[in-house]
Amino acid sequence: MAHEKRILLPQDLRPIHTLDAYKATGGTRGIDRARSMKPRDVIEELKKAGLRGRGGAGFPTAIKWTTAFEDPSPTKYVVCNGSEGEPGTYKDRYLLQKNPYQLVEGAAIAAYVVNAKNVFIGLKAKFKREIANVQRAIDEMVKDNIIAKDYIQIVPGPDEYLFGEEKALLEVVDGRGAMPRIMPPFLQGARYTPTEYNPTIVNNVESLSHVSHILAKGADWFRATGSQDTPGTMIFTLCGDVKRPGMYELPLGTTLRELLFDCGGGPAGNHPVKAVFSGVANRVMTEEIFDTPLGFGTMRTAGGGLGSAGFIVYDQSMCMVKVALMFSSFLAYSSCGQCIPCNRGC
């Protein structure tokens, strides 16, 4: 399947490891345009584009940014969630390996819109290569006067599933362990105090990477592909019992069957596909819903879930009891145990 790559580099393009190389592809045009606009107009551009968060919930980005923008609090922050702990998902790390500049640019645009005091990028401390790439991008943009020194900071975090939960991520940003807070980021943000709640935008790597391109090329360009429910493209990680595991950037609205068979080449062995999971907490997906268009609303309506678009495939040779044991063991180990269903096993 041949589709336009928007944030995932084409196979014939080398990784972008310098700011000059990024600019040669049109990089930094997004932030230049954003800064020539009023902050509310930038939000309107994202609203027109229909960008939804690519981290799992699919929440409209424009609504999230509007909440922070309209809040009268004098101190606000932007946080990028780059922890990526969902089994079967690798796309954010891949983006940071190949082109960290689009993330830094997107984060800087978000910071401009809400007049953020600082930007924090949360990455697992073990992501050594990705941390080095992002820091290099930050340093080059500082040298080029695109962002101020120390304005965007990397926050290394633990190798824990909970680090990817946005309220737990904020705890790590504040120097504590990865245990989720009760209040959401717009009511209890980074560096909060009893008198200052510091509303905070939290977006993941893929979401912020899209922002830089939307501002550079416009909402109509973004909506030219994808579906009404979920415009644009999304990166799908495909692994397990398929011939061609990997990462595929596809228009939303592409069917699950096309992802599995046209991109992934179908089952790797002689057994048909038995089950597909889009994350360990989502329900099992079987043949009956393979023709469902990939999108947040369409997958939910079909009884499945899009999640962060990491798909694990099992063929008929796999024992589903074994899979259930693996998934439940992972969730039991990873749970924070703060709410009743996980604490009591209800």
What are these regions, as identified by a protein language model?
Residues 99-113:
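Histidine-anchored nucleotide/phosphate-binding helix
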Residues 1-49, 112, 116-121, 232, ...:
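Iron-sulfur (Fe-S) cluster-binding modules
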Residues 131-252, 264:
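Hydrophobic alpha-helical positions that pack around
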Residues 29-45, 74-76, 82, 91-96, ...:
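Ferredoxin-type iron-sulfur electron-transfer modules in oxidoreductases and energy-metabolism complexes
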Residues 48-62, 161-163, 274-283, 304, ...:
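Local cysteine-cluster metal-coordination motifs and their immediate loop/turn environment
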Residues 64, 119, 264-280:
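Short loop-to-beta-strand transition segments
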Residues 34-76:
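N-terminal glycine-rich phosphate/pyrophosphate-binding loops that anchor nucleotide-derived ligands
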Residues 22-28, 80-92, 191-194, 237-242:
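Gly-rich Lys/Arg/Thr-decorated short loops/hinges at beta-loop-alpha junctions or inter-strand turns
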